[in-house]
Curated annotation (Swiss-Prot):
Source taxon at top rank: Bacteria
Protein name (Swiss-Prot/TrEMBL): Hemin import ATP-binding protein HmuV
Organism: Bordetella pertussis (strain Tohama I / ATCC BAA-589 / NCTC 13251)
UniProt keyword terms in alphabetical order: ATP-binding, Cell inner membrane, Cell membrane, Membrane, Nucleotide-binding, Translocase, Transport
Record flagged with keyword Manganese: no
Amino acid sequence: MTLQARNLTLARGGAPILTDVSLTLAPGALVGLLGANGAGKSTLLAALAGELAPRSGQVFLGDADLATLSARQLARRRAVLPQKPSLSFDLGVSDVVGMGAYPFPELDPAAVRQLVRDALEQAGVTHLAQRRYPQLSGGEQQRVQFARVLAQCHAMHAPGQTRYLMLDEPISNLDPRHQMELLATARALAHEAGMGVLVIVHDINQAARWCDTLALLADGRLAALGPPADVLTPDHMRRVYGIEADVLAHPTLPGRLLVLAR
Protein backbone atom coordinates (compact mmCIF):
# COMPACT_ATOMS: atom_id res chain seq x y z
CA MET A 1 0.00 0.00 0.00
CA THR A 2 1.44 3.36 -1.03
CA LEU A 3 0.88 6.97 -0.02
CA GLN A 4 0.46 8.85 -3.26
CA ALA A 5 0.06 12.50 -4.18
CA ARG A 6 -1.53 12.97 -7.58
CA ASN A 7 -1.25 16.28 -9.42
CA LEU A 8 -1.33 18.44 -6.30
CA THR A 9 -1.83 22.16 -6.69
CA LEU A 10 -2.00 24.37 -3.62
CA ALA A 11 -2.05 28.14 -3.16
CA ARG A 12 -2.04 30.60 -0.27
CA GLY A 13 -3.53 34.04 -0.65
CA GLY A 14 -3.74 33.50 -4.38
CA ALA A 15 -0.02 32.75 -4.65
CA PRO A 16 0.82 29.26 -5.96
CA ILE A 17 2.83 27.10 -3.55
CA LEU A 18 2.63 23.75 -5.35
CA THR A 19 1.78 23.20 -9.01
CA ASP A 20 0.84 19.78 -10.41
CA VAL A 21 3.11 17.77 -8.09
CA SER A 22 2.90 13.98 -8.01
CA LEU A 23 4.91 11.85 -5.59
CA THR A 24 4.64 8.29 -4.27
CA LEU A 25 5.87 7.16 -0.86
CA ALA A 26 6.19 3.38 -0.87
CA PRO A 27 6.83 0.96 1.99
CA GLY A 28 10.49 0.12 2.50
CA ALA A 29 11.82 3.33 0.95
CA LEU A 30 13.47 6.45 2.38
CA VAL A 31 12.59 9.41 0.16
CA GLY A 32 14.46 12.68 0.53
CA LEU A 33 12.73 15.95 -0.35
CA LEU A 34 15.15 18.65 -1.50
CA GLY A 35 14.88 22.20 -2.77
CA ALA A 36 15.84 25.78 -2.07
CA ASN A 37 14.12 27.84 0.61
CA GLY A 38 10.51 28.51 -0.34
CA ALA A 39 10.35 25.70 -2.89
CA GLY A 40 7.27 24.16 -1.25
CA LYS A 41 8.84 21.23 0.61
CA SER A 42 7.04 21.67 3.92
CA THR A 43 3.78 22.36 2.12
CA LEU A 44 4.09 19.13 0.14
CA LEU A 45 4.86 17.17 3.31
CA ALA A 46 1.84 18.69 5.05
CA ALA A 47 -0.39 17.79 2.10
CA LEU A 48 0.92 14.21 2.10
CA ALA A 49 0.21 14.05 5.82
CA GLY A 50 -3.37 15.20 5.30
CA GLU A 51 -2.80 18.43 7.21
CA LEU A 52 -3.33 20.73 4.21
CA ALA A 53 -6.05 20.33 1.60
CA PRO A 54 -4.91 20.91 -1.99
CA ARG A 55 -6.79 23.26 -4.29
CA SER A 56 -6.76 20.48 -6.85
CA GLY A 57 -5.38 16.97 -6.98
CA GLN A 58 -5.65 14.25 -4.37
CA VAL A 59 -3.62 12.25 -1.87
CA PHE A 60 -4.37 8.55 -1.56
CA LEU A 61 -3.45 6.06 1.14
CA GLY A 62 -3.93 2.88 -0.80
CA ASP A 63 -7.38 3.31 -2.32
CA ALA A 64 -8.59 5.79 0.32
CA ASP A 65 -8.61 9.52 -0.36
CA LEU A 66 -6.93 11.19 2.63
CA ALA A 67 -9.70 13.79 2.64
CA THR A 68 -12.13 11.07 3.76
CA LEU A 69 -10.06 10.04 6.80
CA SER A 70 -10.44 11.59 10.25
CA ALA A 71 -7.53 13.09 12.18
CA ARG A 72 -7.50 10.05 14.46
CA GLN A 73 -7.48 7.63 11.53
CA LEU A 74 -4.55 9.50 10.01
CA ALA A 75 -2.64 9.53 13.31
CA ARG A 76 -2.95 5.76 13.49
CA ARG A 77 -1.32 5.35 10.06
CA ARG A 78 1.30 8.08 9.84
CA ALA A 79 3.50 10.09 12.19
CA VAL A 80 4.69 13.63 11.46
CA LEU A 81 7.63 15.51 12.94
CA PRO A 82 7.09 19.19 12.05
CA GLN A 83 9.94 21.56 11.40
CA LYS A 84 9.27 23.52 14.59
CA PRO A 85 7.20 21.48 17.06
CA SER A 86 5.28 23.79 19.38
CA LEU A 87 5.08 22.70 23.00
CA SER A 88 4.54 25.37 25.64
CA PHE A 89 3.78 23.11 28.61
CA ASP A 90 6.35 22.29 31.28
CA LEU A 91 6.33 18.54 30.71
CA GLY A 92 8.89 15.90 31.48
CA VAL A 93 10.69 14.27 28.59
CA SER A 94 8.98 10.91 29.13
CA ASP A 95 5.59 12.65 29.07
CA VAL A 96 6.43 14.30 25.75
CA VAL A 97 7.49 11.00 24.22
CA GLY A 98 4.35 9.37 25.62
CA MET A 99 2.26 11.80 23.56
CA GLY A 100 3.06 9.53 20.63
CA ALA A 101 0.63 7.00 22.12
CA TYR A 102 -2.30 9.45 22.33
CA PRO A 103 -3.98 8.14 19.14
CA PHE A 104 -4.07 4.66 20.71
CA PRO A 105 -6.33 4.83 23.79
CA GLU A 106 -6.64 1.05 23.80
CA LEU A 107 -3.04 0.72 25.05
CA ASP A 108 -2.73 0.10 28.78
CA PRO A 109 -0.30 2.18 30.89
CA ALA A 110 2.30 -0.58 31.00
CA ALA A 111 2.35 -0.83 27.21
CA VAL A 112 2.73 2.95 26.90
CA ARG A 113 5.63 2.96 29.35
CA GLN A 114 7.36 0.26 27.29
CA LEU A 115 6.78 2.24 24.09
CA VAL A 116 8.36 5.28 25.73
CA ARG A 117 11.38 3.31 26.93
CA ASP A 118 11.92 1.76 23.51
CA ALA A 119 11.55 5.10 21.71
CA LEU A 120 13.92 6.88 24.10
CA GLU A 121 16.51 4.18 23.52
CA GLN A 122 16.09 4.14 19.75
CA ALA A 123 16.45 7.94 19.59
CA GLY A 124 19.46 7.85 21.91
CA VAL A 125 17.89 10.08 24.56
CA THR A 126 17.35 7.70 27.48
CA HIS A 127 19.68 9.87 29.55
CA LEU A 128 17.21 12.76 29.18
CA ALA A 129 14.18 10.82 30.44
CA GLN A 130 14.03 12.56 33.83
CA ARG A 131 14.65 16.07 32.48
CA ARG A 132 12.04 18.78 31.91
CA TYR A 133 11.46 19.43 28.22
CA PRO A 134 11.70 23.28 28.35
CA GLN A 135 15.14 23.02 29.97
CA LEU A 136 16.65 21.14 27.03
CA SER A 137 18.74 22.62 24.25
CA GLY A 138 17.26 22.97 20.78
CA GLY A 139 19.06 19.87 19.57
CA GLU A 140 17.96 17.84 22.58
CA GLN A 141 14.36 18.91 22.06
CA GLN A 142 14.57 17.87 18.41
CA ARG A 143 15.79 14.41 19.39
CA VAL A 144 13.06 14.06 22.03
CA GLN A 145 10.45 14.98 19.42
CA PHE A 146 11.95 12.32 17.17
CA ALA A 147 11.49 9.84 20.02
CA ARG A 148 7.84 10.94 20.24
CA VAL A 149 7.13 10.07 16.61
CA LEU A 150 9.05 6.81 17.02
CA ALA A 151 6.71 5.90 19.88
CA GLN A 152 3.76 6.69 17.62
CA CYS A 153 5.21 4.54 14.84
CA HIS A 154 5.70 1.58 17.16
CA ALA A 155 2.18 1.96 18.55
CA MET A 156 0.63 1.90 15.09
CA HIS A 157 2.23 -1.42 14.19
CA ALA A 158 -0.41 -3.85 12.94
CA PRO A 159 -0.03 -6.94 10.72
CA GLY A 160 -0.42 -6.13 7.04
CA GLN A 161 -0.67 -2.38 7.61
CA THR A 162 1.94 -0.02 6.17
CA ARG A 163 3.15 2.77 8.43
CA TYR A 164 4.46 6.14 7.29
CA LEU A 165 6.83 8.61 8.90
CA MET A 166 7.32 12.19 7.70
CA LEU A 167 10.20 14.28 9.00
CA ASP A 168 10.47 18.00 8.25
CA GLU A 169 14.10 19.10 8.63
CA PRO A 170 14.73 16.74 11.57
CA ILE A 171 18.48 17.38 11.64
CA SER A 172 18.49 21.19 11.46
CA ASN A 173 19.58 21.62 15.10
CA LEU A 174 21.77 18.54 15.41
CA ASP A 175 25.52 18.11 15.44
CA PRO A 176 27.10 15.86 12.77
CA ARG A 177 27.07 12.72 14.93
CA HIS A 178 23.41 13.02 15.82
CA GLN A 179 22.49 13.93 12.24
CA MET A 180 23.95 10.64 11.06
CA GLU A 181 22.33 8.66 13.89
CA LEU A 182 18.88 10.07 13.17
CA LEU A 183 19.09 9.48 9.43
CA ALA A 184 20.48 5.98 9.98
CA THR A 185 17.46 5.26 12.18
CA ALA A 186 15.12 6.65 9.53
CA ARG A 187 16.67 4.41 6.89
CA ALA A 188 16.45 1.38 9.19
CA LEU A 189 12.75 2.07 9.74
CA ALA A 190 12.30 1.96 5.97
CA HIS A 191 14.58 -0.94 5.06
CA GLU A 192 14.13 -3.16 8.13
CA ALA A 193 10.65 -2.26 9.42
CA GLY A 194 9.09 -1.73 5.99
CA MET A 195 7.87 1.79 6.67
CA GLY A 196 7.53 4.52 4.08
CA VAL A 197 9.70 7.42 5.25
CA LEU A 198 9.86 10.96 3.85
CA VAL A 199 12.52 13.37 5.08
CA ILE A 200 13.16 17.01 4.21
CA VAL A 201 16.84 17.91 4.36
CA HIS A 202 18.94 20.84 3.18
CA ASP A 203 22.26 18.98 3.30
CA ILE A 204 22.57 17.52 -0.18
CA ASN A 205 25.33 15.13 0.80
CA GLN A 206 23.35 13.72 3.72
CA ALA A 207 20.48 13.14 1.31
CA ALA A 208 22.83 11.46 -1.16
CA ARG A 209 24.22 9.20 1.55
CA TRP A 210 21.02 8.00 3.21
CA CYS A 211 18.10 8.27 0.79
CA ASP A 212 16.93 5.73 -1.77
CA THR A 213 15.01 8.25 -3.85
CA LEU A 214 15.23 12.03 -4.08
CA ALA A 215 12.52 14.50 -5.08
CA LEU A 216 13.82 17.93 -6.04
CA LEU A 217 11.38 20.84 -5.87
CA ALA A 218 11.85 24.20 -7.57
CA ASP A 219 9.29 27.00 -7.28
CA GLY A 220 6.56 24.57 -6.27
CA ARG A 221 7.16 22.17 -9.15
CA LEU A 222 8.90 18.82 -9.25
CA ALA A 223 12.19 19.46 -11.03
CA ALA A 224 13.59 15.94 -10.71
CA LEU A 225 12.63 12.60 -9.16
CA GLY A 226 14.59 9.38 -8.97
CA PRO A 227 17.71 7.79 -7.49
CA PRO A 228 20.37 10.22 -6.25
CA ALA A 229 22.51 9.71 -9.36
CA ASP A 230 19.67 10.96 -11.56
CA VAL A 231 18.74 13.92 -9.36
CA LEU A 232 22.07 15.24 -8.09
CA THR A 233 23.52 16.38 -11.39
CA PRO A 234 25.52 19.55 -12.08
CA ASP A 235 22.67 20.81 -14.25
CA HIS A 236 20.07 20.38 -11.50
CA MET A 237 22.37 22.03 -8.95
CA ARG A 238 22.75 24.99 -11.28
CA ARG A 239 19.06 25.34 -12.15
CA VAL A 240 17.61 24.74 -8.69
CA TYR A 241 20.24 26.16 -6.34
CA GLY A 242 22.13 28.51 -8.63
CA ILE A 243 25.47 26.90 -7.82
CA GLU A 244 28.20 25.27 -9.86
CA ALA A 245 29.00 21.84 -8.45
CA ASP A 246 31.01 18.73 -9.17
CA VAL A 247 29.26 15.41 -8.52
CA LEU A 248 31.72 12.64 -7.69
CA ALA A 249 31.65 9.04 -6.57
CA HIS A 250 31.95 8.99 -2.79
CA PRO A 251 35.52 7.99 -1.85
CA THR A 252 34.51 5.62 0.98
CA LEU A 253 30.82 4.74 0.40
CA PRO A 254 30.37 2.56 -2.70
CA GLY A 255 27.39 3.56 -4.81
CA ARG A 256 27.01 6.93 -3.08
CA LEU A 257 27.74 10.42 -4.38
CA LEU A 258 29.55 13.47 -3.11
CA VAL A 259 28.46 16.93 -4.27
CA LEU A 260 31.13 19.63 -4.07
CA ALA A 261 30.10 23.22 -4.66
CA ARG A 262 32.76 25.28 -6.40
